[in-house]
Amino acid sequence: MFYAHFVLSKRGPLAKIWLAAHWDKKLTKAHVFECNLESSVESIISPKVKMALRTSGHLLLGVVRIYHRKAKYLLADCNEAFIKIKMAFRPGVVDLPEENREAAYNAITLPEEFHDFDQPLPDLDDIDVAQQFSLNQSRVEEITMREEVGNISILQENDFGDFGMDDREIMREGSAFEDDDMLVSTTTSNLLLESEQSTSNLNEKINHLEYEDQYKDDNFGEGNDGGILDDKLISNNDGGIFDDPPALSEAGVMLPEQPAHDDMDEDDNVSMGGPDSPDSVDPVEPMPTMTDQTTLVPNEEEAFALEPIDITVKETKAKRKRKLIVDSVKELDSKTIRAQLSDYSDIVTTLDLAPPTKKLMMWKETGGVEKLFSLPAQPLWNNRLLKLFTRCLTPLVPEDLRKRRKGGEADNLDEFLKEFENPEVPREDQQQQHQQRDVIDEPIIEEPSRLQESVMEASRTNIDESAMPPPPPQGVKRKAGQIDPEPVMPPQQVEQMEIPPVELPPEEPPNICQLIPELELLPEKEKEKEKEKEDDEEEEDEDASGGDQDQEERRWNKRTQQMLHGLQRALAKTGAESISLLELCRNTNRKQAAAKFYSFLVLKKQQAIELTQEEPYSDIIATPGPRFHII
């Protein structure tokens, strides 16, 4: 941890500083004044227990915060004292006598003012209502499309039949213009009409009124039932070229009847015209004469009546109601809480401590099955040595077994594996015998450059090894001895017979390991084989039941003890000072050789023998140790 427990304790010397660094709001004004910064800084500089740099940094932050708050409180007290002093010693303030301690009534009472409630209300004309409403009103030209209003075709003479329609006769129908003016004023707004008006239009309107007064009682145009104008202008039947919606007829129906014009035709209600006031007069533009203009009269009038635009209300998305989710389980049982408190599996892991020493760490790294079967017992950093070691680990399959495997002579896999794992295969015996012959031939090739004594010694050893009788008949070993030819031995024996015999003492040979007589060790080997079988059975039982220490003691008591006694008898009889493991393991299978090698290691551990090896993969020489004759 980067902090010490004494820092976090409530009564510790740095408790308030630690609290100020991590929870500043928890400190009160009393805590700030009680904190002694000098002692705290000294305890941070020279702490009783070693603190991490991170802890000291946090404590310095707490010191700075406490100092800041102390300075702030001091400044506030100074300001308050300054204000009080300033208020107490104001210039010109005199202490009041006892008579004037009570203030006057007029000084502390507000005067009562009664206003006149009979005042007239302000004039409504003073309030500019239009200005208030025009703030949010757009200009007509900006929001309205300009439309070209055509001329009234009925005002032009078209010489239709004998019905002479001159200007004076048409102007008698002044009521038609008046009614049409009412229609336009009631259905459309004056804002949609152009404001520019010429003086000629006003004069023309005055002439219309004069003609109407003169010929009011003329009754011209009565009895025109079924007339051309009546059929074309008043009829509401469909089929017109520009007859879209009947908006004009509806507006004409809604107009009230006027009693001043009782003698007027039905055309007066539908005919067009301008309003009475000059403000609403429609400016008429001259248009060229067109054919069949009578059918276009109602359609042109419809251009004035714009259809009302639907008010588009902005649709707002309805807020989706929140669905209230209520838990089915509202309370936790005490059993559930206890189970959660007792369950600490997520914060606890298995304890995996590293070995205390480097040697144990190295053993742990290289003690696995993968490393034991792929690397030697000692660290080899050279790649060549590792290749040599791995080359010895690869088994050589005999050729006859390969042929049998390819030819399918093996009955099943178990038989093939048994034959492959059998250490007494002729192939291995032949290889061992070839190695023996190589060992025998090497000194013979180098003999001419040595003295005669060395030649005699080598010949003696060769004679002893060649004269060694074969081991007792045991299956394949006897056959291997018969099959093994020895073409080199007869010439060696001939050369040895020609050399004069020289008597040599047994102590003089340089390599006494080769003088170990195999005849004396044969009965011991047979006994060892029988005992090894018994030991194997006992070891299997011990693996299932006993401990490791008991197994090691039993192995030492039986197999290793027999090896030690055999070595003692061999060295006593031959007088040799050392024994070769390679010579001791001749004519044995792999299991027996491994057992002897293991016995050598146990004896070396018990200081019964000393082992020496000149180079890797060379022969191991055993010499008596300090406890060779004691055990």
Swiss-Prot record:
CDD domains: Rad21_Rec8_M_NXP1-like (cd21792). Changing R450A: Abolishes second cleavage by ESPL1, no effect on nuclear localization. Expressed in the gut (at protein level). Residues 126-282 are annotated as: Required for interaction with SMARCA5. Residues 271-285 have a biased composition (Low complexity). GO terms for biological process: apoptotic process; cell division; chromatin looping; chromosome segregation; DNA recombination; double-strand break repair; establishment of meiotic sister chromatid cohesion; establishment of mitotic sister chromatid cohesion. The keyword Glycosyltransferase does not apply. SUPFAM superfamilies: Winged helix' DNA-binding domain. InterPro entries: NXP1_M-like, Rad21/Rec8-like, Rad21/Rec8_C_eu, Rad21_Rec8_N, ScpA-like_C, WH_DNA-bd_sf. The modification Phosphothreonine is found at T394, T623. There is a cross-link at K48, K216, K418 (Glycyl lysine isopeptide (Lys-Gly) (interchain with G-Cter in SUMO2)). Transmembrane segments: none annotated. Cleaved by separase/ESPL1 at the onset of anaphase; this cleavage is required for sister chromatid separation and cytokinesis. Cleaved by caspase-3/CASP3 or caspase-7/CASP7 at the beginning of apoptosis. The keyword Membrane does not apply. Keywords: Activator, Apoptosis, Cell cycle, Cell division, Centromere, Chromosome, Chromosome partition, Cytoplasm, Cytoskeleton, Developmental protein, Disease variant, DNA damage, DNA repair, DNA-binding, Intellectual disability, Isopeptide bond, Mitosis, Nucleus, Phosphoprotein, Repressor, Transcription, Transcription regulation, Ubl conjugation. Residues 423-440, 522-532 have a biased composition (Basic and acidic residues). One of its GO terms (cellular component) is chromosome, centromeric region. The modification Phosphoserine is found at S46, S153, S175, S249, S454, S545. Residues 287-403 are annotated as: Interaction with WAPL and PDS5B. Residues 533-551 have a biased composition (Acidic residues). The record marks R172, E173, D279, S280, R450, L451 as: Cleavage. Residues 154-171 are annotated as: Interaction with NIPBL. It is linked to Cornelia de Lange syndrome 4 with or without midline brain defects: A form of Cornelia de Lange syndrome, a clinically heterogeneous developmental disorder associated with malformations affecting multiple systems. It is characterized by facial dysmorphisms, abnormal hands and feet, growth delay, cognitive retardation, hirsutism, gastroesophageal dysfunction and cardiac, ophthalmologic and genitourinary anomalies. Component of the cohesin complex, which consists of an SMC1A/B and SMC3 heterodimer core and 2 non-Smc subunits RAD21 and STAG1/SA1, STAG2/SA2 or STAG3/SA3. Interacts (via C-terminus) with SMC1A and (via N-terminus) with SMC3; these interactions are direct. The cohesin complex interacts with NUMA1. The cohesin complex also interacts with CDCA5, PDS5A and PDS5B; this interaction might regulate the ability of the cohesin complex to mediate sister chromatid cohesion. The interaction with PDS5B is direct and is stimulated by STAG1/SA1. Belongs to the rad21 family. This is Double-strand-break repair protein rad21 homolog. The lineage of its organism: Eukaryota, Metazoa, Chordata, Craniata, Vertebrata.
